[in-house]
A protein has these predicted regions:
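Catalytic helix-loop patch of NAD(P)-dependent Rossmann-fold dehydrogenases
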Residues: 1-66, 71-77
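C-terminal substrate-binding subdomain of Rossmann-fold SDR/epimerase-dehydratase oxidoreductases
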Residues: 18, 23, 29, 75-243
């Protein structure tokens, strides 16, 4: 709820249509059919239609933001972006316990990283372990933006003289592989991340949306909004916060 009692904002997040995503059209805008893929998305879609109903039938100032994935260092740890950056921070702290020049990194049958420092004084050796990063579908495409940009869009919707519904997105789609590339680059890791990641089927979603790429032309034209944060800067900020 924003402003006076007649101003309502509802953020629908991603429920835009899977039937469109699986066809050659590789973008989604306000005209794309909705196709919610989870109970959460179904509930958000109901709220979206409620906002439209109260606006069109009762003249209330209600807006819905159709928000594509928006991230920041405050993102919950169960979401894949923050899961990756938090794991990187923990991995760096683990690795720094021993001079990285002295360790041999391998993995055992349980997909656990193992460091073996060079021979210490005497016959003793120290062994320590750290779990690999377990992820699902690395080829899923997402349109990731910075939460600061999206909150600015919400505020601008509520300041406009006419209520409406808008897609809020970046217009760029990146895979989880690309997120990993940027995240490990941001931590200055000098090896490939492929040996540090395990593909775990339990992290595959039963109703996966393969491709998301939002078109924000409408909100740019009506409100002069566009994203300020680049994908690379967003990832770097999240990694830096977790280091």
């Amino acid at each position: 709820m924003f402003g006076d009692e007649y101003d309502v904002y509802e953020g629908i997040e991603i429920t835009i249509g899977d039937e469109n995503i699986r066809c050659p059209i590789k973008y989604q805008d306000e005209r794309t059919p909705f196709s919610p893929q989870s109970p959460y998305a179904i509930a958000k879609l109901a709220a979206h239609h409620a906002c439209r109903l109260y606006r069109e039938s009762y003249g209330l100032f209600t807006c819905s933001g159709i928000l594509f994935n928006h991230e920041s260092p405050r993102r919950g740890e169960k979401f894949v972006t923050r899961k990756i950056t938090k794991w990187i921070g923990e991995f760096v702290r683990w690795r720094n316990r021993i001079d990285s020049q002295l360790i041999d990194v391998s993995s055992d049958e349980n997909d656990v990283l193992k460091i073996s420092p060079k021979e210490l004084e005497g016959d003793g050796r120290v062994t320590d372990t750290f779990p690999k990063l377990r992820l699902g579908n690395l080829d899923a495409h997402r349109d990731w933006g910075h939460a600061k940009d999206y909150v600015r869009a919400m505020w601008m919707m509520m300041q406009h003289d006419k209520p409406d519904d808008y897609v809020v997105a970046t217009g760029e789609s990146h895979t989880i592989r690309e997120f990993l590339d940027e995240a490990f680059f941001a931590m200055n890791y000098d090896g490939g991340w492929e040996d540090l990641v395990v593909i775990d089927p339990k992290f595959y979603r039963p109703s996966e949306v393969d491709y998301l790429n939002g078109v924000y032309d409408k909100i740019e034209t009506a409100l002069d909004w566009k994203p300020k944060y680049a994908f690379e800067d967003l990832v770097a900020e999240m990694v830096e916060e977790d280091l």
